[in-house]
């Protein structure tokens, strides 16, 4: 089980990403737009840099929703590999079966 502080930190990052998503997208569009003047693009870059670091989605880490484990997490289920295995063997995930060929 991951430390509770690490799990809470990730939740805080997720909130910040959601809060600044529109603003970040607008600024990134201005920076990428070649038709804008150099000065406008520079100002947009400065505003983008002024946003909180944790508002950047690349700083988020996918964690298991049960244990908080940061590695070996399946995006589709939001679970770590070992918890996914336990739950799948109990038959609690509909349509998920062990591979057999």
Swiss-Prot record:
An MF annotation (GO) of this entry: structural constituent of ribosome
Assigned GO CC terms: cytoplasm; small ribosomal subunit
GO biological process: translation
Signal peptide: none
Domain of life: Bacteria
InterPro entries referenced in this protein's UniProt entry, alphabetically: Ribosomal_uS14 (IPR001209), Ribosomal_uS14_bac/plastid (IPR023036)
Pfam families for the chain: Ribosomal_S14
Keywords annotated in UniProt: Ribonucleoprotein, Ribosomal protein, RNA-binding, rRNA-binding
Database matches in HAMAP family: Ribosomal_uS14_1
Quaternary structure note: Part of the 30S ribosomal subunit. Contacts proteins S3 and S10.
Family membership noted in the UniProt record: Belongs to the universal ribosomal protein uS14 family.
Functional description taken from the UniProt entry: Binds 16S rRNA, required for the assembly of 30S particles and may also be responsible for determining the conformation of the 16S rRNA at the A site.
The protein's name in its UniProt record: Small ribosomal subunit protein uS14
Species whose genome carries this gene: Ralstonia pickettii (strain 12J)
């Amino acid at each position: 089980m991951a430390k509770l502080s690490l799990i809470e930190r990730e939740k805080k990052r997720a909130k910040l990403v959601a809060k600044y998503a529109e603003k970040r997208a607008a600024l990134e569009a201005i920076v990428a737009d070649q038709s804008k003047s150099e000065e406008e693009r520079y100002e947009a870059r400065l505003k983008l840099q002024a946003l909180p670091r944790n508002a950047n989605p690349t700083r988020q880490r996918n964690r298991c929703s049960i244990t908080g484990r940061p590695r070996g997490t399946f995006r589709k289920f939001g679970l770590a590999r070992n918890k996914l295995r336990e739950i799948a063997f109990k038959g609690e995930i509909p349509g998920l079966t062990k591979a057999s060929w």
